[in-house]
Amino acid sequence: MLKSKTIDRVAAAGITLAAAFCLLAMVFSDAIAEAFGGAGVSMEYETELFDTSKIIEIDISMDEDDWAEMLENATSEEYYECDVTINGTTFYRVGIRPKGNTSLTSIANDPDTDRYSFKLEFDQYVDGQTCWGLDKLVLNNNYADATNMKEALTYDMFQFLGADASLYNYAEISVNGEYWGVYLALEAVEDSFMLRNYGVSDGELYKPEGMDGGGGGGFSMNGGGADLNYTVDDLDSYSTIWEGEVTNTTDADHERVVAALQKAGEGEELETYLDVDNLLRYMAVHSFVVNEDSLSGNMPHNYYLYEYDGQLNIIPWDYNLTLGGMGMEAFGGRGGGPGGMSFDGSGSDAGSSAVLQNAVWYSGCFLLLVIALLIAGVYRRRPKIRRRRNRQKALPPGT
């Protein structure tokens, strides 16, 4: 009995120390990043575009016939040439195209609106052109979100916890001088995103989808999609990941991903094969907002997978259906409750589940981050918790 109590006390003390360590790491993250090296790079577009104290003003100028043709053939998602003036600065020969999955097809089938979401690709026609360092800007129409706030609030939470996530701001859009509405502008997850967050742009990036269903590893048996569970060593079994490559990848790159998925699924050397620090922050927000249109939903998609030197990281994407949005009958939702938001090992991401099964990471870090979100909601204005932006392995529990 005495031995049992002693063990319990030691375990409790260990969790308390781990919680204190996590809190100190959040407070002194800049110093940690400097000590470990590999900090992210400050980009000019952070202040030029994503200063949320002021709305972005964007005017798109393009041939009227090209604009009409693009809208008429929106589902082809082909780029057209335009000039874009952002806050008074004009960028010439920019690529523009409609974007989306359900939102794209729904708008295309609606005779009453052409209010698509768009992508602006600044180097589509001019090599090396950027928007203050940004290679691509996403303009979301906040489809199926009557508040026009769900995605913005979610990205604000990610920023507050210091997770690797896109910067955001609202933007007033006009086309050839005609007002087109308010959109949510997002930093695309591409080279400039990697440079800002990791200090390099040579990691491997994927956006798994698999929305057409199929078989083999990488597919969810619950209704299609692209999960992150290890099945076999055969690379072809993970086609939903490779087909979503954003960077140019090779079989050697794919082998590193599969090896990491295997180790993560087995719960082995998690801090070596997963960016545990960022995953805890990602899961805290992700669970808080209940996003079933995601990796943890019935059809896993809407996320980016980043791999560098054999270590995996998850980057969030597409949060307009958070906070019960998937409960809408039109999307076949299950009520928007937390029952479908599980990282318990039975879902589509065994690695994240393994992280939360570690008592120190769960009680000492994950719950602390969720509590921080709750406190921030009560007091509204709050300092942001920074994360050490580097490519070093996450510090092991109890360090």
Residues of each region from the PLM?
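Active-site acidic catalytic loop and adjacent metal/ATP-binding pocket
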Residues: 60, 120, 271-325
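Internal "kinase-insert"/substrate-recognition segments embedded within catalytic cores
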Residues: 121, 126-127, 163-164, 178-284, ...
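Alpha-helical transmembrane segments
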Residues: 24, 369-382
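N-terminal Sec-pathway targeting helices
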Residues: 1-18, 357-361, 378-386
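Disordered, low-complexity segments in secreted/periplasmic proteins that are enriched in proline
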Residues: 211-227, 326-357, 365-368, 375, ...
